[in-house]
Structures are given as C-alpha cells and as structure tokens.
Amino acid sequence: MENTPGALIAMSGGVDSSVAAYLMKQAGYRCMGATMRLYQNEDLGQCGFHTCCSAKDVEDAADVAFQLDIPFEVINYTDEFREKVIKKFISTYETGGTPNPCIDCNRYMKFDKMLAFAREHGLDYVVTGHYARIEQDPDTGRWLLKKALYGEKDQSYVLYVLTQDELAHTRFPLGGMDKPSIRALAEKADFCNAHKHDSQDICFVPDGDYVGFMERYTGKFYPDGDFIDTTGKVVGRHHGAVRYTNGQRKGLGLALGAPVYVCDKDMEKNTVTVGPESELFTTTLVAGDFNWISIPELTAPMRVKAKARYRQPEQPATVRPLPDGKVEVEFDEPQRAITRGQAVVLYDGDVVVGGGTIL
C-alpha cells in the first residue's frame, strides 16, 4: 500500500467531485476526501440559498466518502479565503474593475492550499471535478493544461493560474466526460447527490447582490453619483459606481432617446460614463500577473486565440511581450466590452498557453 499513489479529492458535495472520487477509487488510488470551509453563511448575512460550503454540502460530501469507504475531513480556510479572495473581490470593484473570484479561489485555495494539505498527509495528487485535461509535453517535459473534450463544460479558462508543480500533482478525471455520463455514474453508485443542481458561480454572493454583500461586509455605503456622456455632460444620476460594469445596458434608469451602455467609470469622481454601443469596441488590451503554461515565458510576438471573458468564443489575436512581465493582446477584430479585472486566457488549439488579469 505504501507504493500506491495517494489522492486528495476536493469534495464540494456536488456530483462532479463525487464522481471524481469514485473514479480515483476505482483506479486503485489511496483516496482521502476533503471539503474546504471557506466562509460562514451567517457571517455574510445569507441563508436559504444553495451555495457551496453549506452544512448540506458538507453532509453530502461526507456521505459519499462514507459510501466509498475513504477518510474524510473538513478543512477550515476561512481566514485565508477572506484575505486572498474576498478582500481582492471587494478591492477590484472599488477600483473600477470586475473581478472573477473563482479564479482566485482556484489559485489560492483549491490547488495551493489543498496540495500542501495533501503532501502533509502523504498524498501525491489533488483531484477535483473540473472539466479540463492535463498532459505532459513529451518534447519539452512541460505540463500542459488542455480544454475538456466536451466544450460546453470546459473550465480551462478559470484554471490558467495553475503552476507547473500544481499541474504535475493534479488530476482531472472528468476531462473526457460529459455531464449525462457523470450523472449516470453517480446513479450507478447510488450517490445521494446524483441529481443535485450545480452550485452558484460566486458562492459567497448567492443572491447576486454583490454590492449589498460588499456593504454588509465592509460597513461602507457606496453613494450616488453622476452619469456622464462621452463629452462629460451630466445625463443622470446613478446609485454608486461599483454597481455598474463595462458594457452594461440594463438597470441604468436612463431615457436618452437611444440605447446607451456603460463605457467607463471614474471611481475617484464617482462618475459613470455612458455612450452608444460603438464606444465599447476595442482591438487591444494589456494584461498583467501572467502565468505561462505551455511556454516558460513570452519572448516574441505569438499568434493565439484569446478569450477575454468566460463565455466568449475564442478570438484570433497576436500577443506581444511588454516590460515588467505585462503583455499586449491585439485581436484581429474589435472586441466588445473588454473589462478590467477579468482574465484573458490564450489558447493554441486545445492547449492553454497562459493567462493573466486585464489591466
């Protein structure tokens, strides 16, 4: 048994991570299940919503672990989650961006912290229910992150932060499967969560009212301010600049005779600039905090396909290195509502080249 590889299964209580645990156990790994406690629902002023980290989720994960006859633990990472994810989420909104906290959770919690926990317990791999694939390049030896075989479920966009060490010690057993097959396996195993709904994207804001969450969490109040047009003329009043994101049309409460969209925000002046949809299109962006996966670094311009938001189809582009580790991404065609704080992820076929944060 000592030579049998060991796997720590990150179990959310959902069907995907449960089937991932099932598959690893079937493959002969020494398995241990663990659920992360990232926050207390009562601390966020929320109850009655389906979120991860709920008592029901922990119960479901524990039940599946019991069925699989594997040890199970709940790990308390509430302090780390507050510092690394929630505070960055709030600061990104307060400085005019639109964050993607799922990426930071993957970076700091699901892989960094969980891999350390696995090693402390003599386990070799972290296993999650993400839809993506990992392979090693036979020529370079680098570990590659690849898209899931079934594109509609692919989650490689939110996994671009994984390091070479993390990729070498991570397994995604669902990368070649579709959702119906996964639910069928859960039914076969008689798991209690075989038909459980998928969790919310932002688990700690289950009602979608992120400004309400920020006000409760910080004790701040985000004041009203002016809507202005692209010439600087005041055209109305808004209810706090943090409430609006680039490209937004709904919920502005403006009647200007033609549709207008959020084009920019000045957080110091608390103004929100609105204009016609044509103002939203641009061909270039600059990104920082870049993580390269298929290459060690970018030294020359490279042709790629790029995604500047999760649900966007990949677009042909050229990426160029800039000083201080930043990159410029120039799209072949203008892109709508590129937004600070979101991720841009670069692809070469089904391989993730790398990704970073839009500045």
Identify the role of each PLM range.
Residues V127-I134, P138-D139, L144-L359:
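AMP-forming adenylation/ATP pyrophosphatase catalytic core
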